[in-house]
Design a protein with these regions (language model features):
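N-terminal pre-domain segments of enzymes
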Residues: 1-12
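Short, solvent-exposed beta-strand/turn "edge" segments of beta-rich domains on protein surfaces
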Residues: 10, 59-62
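Short glycine/threonine/proline-enriched tight-turn/helix- or strand-capping micro-motif at secondary-structure
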Residues: 2-3, 51-55
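Mature N-terminal segment immediately following signal peptide/propeptide cleavage
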Residues: 13-21
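Accessory beta-strand-rich segments of carbohydrate-active enzymes
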Residues: 5-6, 20-25, 62-193
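Short Gly/aromatic-enriched secondary-structure transition segments
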Residues: 30-40
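Single conserved hydrophobic/aromatic residue that forms the stacking wall/gate
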Residues: 196-204
Length: 204
């Protein structure tokens, strides 16, 4: 997948900056947080790892889904082109919603992915929501499992332990989570100009 660049025929918009953000308390999908602006939202820089920025265990030890959200708009003059949203990395599972509709899912926190927006855009502001799941297991890279809070270190549920789930990593580095690399919108022409190539014996 080629990295997008700004050219005479391509628009490039970087969505890096401060987004609205909320830890899922288990009701995010039930209450359809992706359909409307997040209530009582925190702010979170993108790109960044949310569990390495905020103080307290609520963020650092969060297990499950979080929601990122912001408004986007696309100039009218580029709507005749192919409009693409590109996420360079989201750890570890992403669901992208535009104006409340699911338009893309991606598993894997270390590779870029993209989705065309043309069929989902409306005039004016568009509500972009990216739901991110940080759960690791033996189908993810890196691999891991599920443990209860403190039980992994204590060998069982002891005094002061909690049955709150948490990731049990099978690796020796921090599990950075969230939208960890830039999110961009770029455009390309709908068609490629006809180009005639003539081969010669010299290979030129």
């Amino acid at each position: 997948m080629l990295y997008p660049v700004l050219t005479q025929s391509r628009l490039l918009s970087d969505l890096s900056g401060v987004w609205n953000f909320k830890l899922d308390n288990g009701k995010g999908f039930e209450e359809k947080w992706y359909e409307k602006p997040l209530k009582d939202a925190d702010t979170m820089p993108v790109p960044a790892s949310y569990n390495d920025l905020k103080e307290g265990t609520d963020f650092r030890d969060h297990y499950g889904w979080v929601f990122y959200q912001r408004n986007i708009s696309v100039p009218e003059y580029v709507k005749s082109q192919r409009i693409v949203l590109r996420c360079a990395a989201v750890t570890h599972y992403a669901m992208i919603y535009l104006n409340g509709k699911l338009i893309c899912e991606h598993k894997g926190g270390f590779l870029p992915f993209e989705v065309e927006l043309n069929d989902h855009l409306q005039d004016g502001d568009n509500l972009l929501t990216i739901a991110v799941n940080n759960v690791i297991d033996y189908t993810t890279l890196p691999v891991g499992g599920k443990a209860n809070m403190m039980s992994g270190m204590m060998g069982g549920m002891g005094a002061g332990a909690s049955d709150k789930p948490q990731n049990n990593p099978n690796f020796d580095f921090f599990n950075y989570c969230g939208i960890t690399r830039p999110v961009k919108i770029y455009t390309t022409p709908e068609t490629v100009s006809y180009t005639h190539l003539r081969a010669h014996e010299t290979g030129r």
